[in-house]
A protein has these predicted regions:
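C-terminal binding/interaction regions
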Residues: 2-19, 65-126
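Feature captures the catalytic cores and cofactor-binding loops of soluble hydro-lyases/lyases
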Residues: 57, 61-65
Length: 126
């Protein structure tokens, strides 16, 4: 699967976002080492702290299906700026793959690629 195909899946996932408060739909497509892809969208909540990001939605779907070896994640947000994962998502993802590729898009379709370890070189670990 190409980076663009994975990003297209992330953009499609954003269509399902529940964002009555933030008005900021985000979609993610997470690829596992065996090629399986899990998508996720962000889900707002009136208690803002209970909101869940698209990246963690996709990761929880993967883990709850028995997948724990992540290779790439594509993140699409409806913004003129690149949609980077928040600190909580970076910490959450590194639990499963410190060196995975993170593709961050903006609404015009362009995207950049980083290694998770570059985006969060110091993370909490036991």
């Amino acid at each position: 699967m190409t980076d663009q195909e994975l990003m297209d899946m992330a953009k499609k996932a954003a269509e399902y976002a529940y964002v009555p408060y933030s008005k900021f739909p985000v979609g993610a497509a997470l690829e596992c080492s065996d090629g399986t892809v899990f998508t996720g969208c962000n889900v707002d909540n009136a208690a803002y702290g209970d909101t869940i990001c698209a990246e963690r939605t996709a990761a929880v779907k993967a883990v709850s299906s028995g997948h724990r070896d992540f290779v790439r994640i594509a993140i699409w947000g409806n913004s003129k700026e690149y949609c980077y994962p928040c600190g909580s998502c970076r910490q959450f993802l590194q639990e499963f793959s410190k060196h995975m590729t993170v593709l961050c898009a903006r609404s015009d379709g362009s995207f950049v690629s980083h290694k998770l370890s570059e985006m969060m070189p110091f993370f909490f670990d036991f």
